[in-house]
From Swiss-Prot:
GO MF term list: retinol binding
Gene: LGB2
Taxonomic superkingdom: Eukaryota
SUPFAM superfamilies: Lipocalins
UniProt protein name: Beta-lactoglobulin-2
Matching Pfam families: Lipocalin
Physiological role: Lactoglobulin is the primary component of whey, it binds retinol and is probably involved in the transport of that molecule.
S-S bonds: C66-C161, C106-C120
Keywords: Disulfide bond, Milk protein, Retinol-binding, Secreted, Transport
Family classification: Belongs to the calycin superfamily. Lipocalin family.
Gene3D superfamilies: 2.40.128.20
Amino acid sequence: TDIPQTMQDLDLQEVAGRWHSVAMVASDISLLDSESAPLRVYVEELRPTPEGNLEIILREGANHVCVERNIVAQKTEDPAVFTVNYQGERKISVLDTDYAHYMFFCVGPCLPSAEHGMVCQYLARTQKVDEEVMEKFSRALQPLPGHVQIIQDPSGGQERCGF
């Protein structure tokens, strides 16, 4: 699955801090359709490391419990692309950000793989959905093949994981 165009010249220090998962999109809805779906995660914070990697603090559902997890995304030659070992080795690509309000990123299928599942998220600094940014998110994902569904955060900003 081809990931839409990534951002040029990502400044890691500028993406540091608290974020909220506002909307999620999947090329295969089974990746998101239940609380324990493999890529249904809620990003809470991004922390750049001194080595240029990106520590991601997230919440996910596991056995009807909301679990906090820290994963480290390893830098690549492209400043907007990282690799992460999360249920297999995957590629994370930052599509766009204005640093102050929103960030769009996609998590690709396990590498190497013929799997086509991809999940993209719209992160915001606040829990309020900006309709203009939502439109921009939708446009950024147009190159994705297959049936794409946008799921706005069902928790409405309440306890992430929705139990």
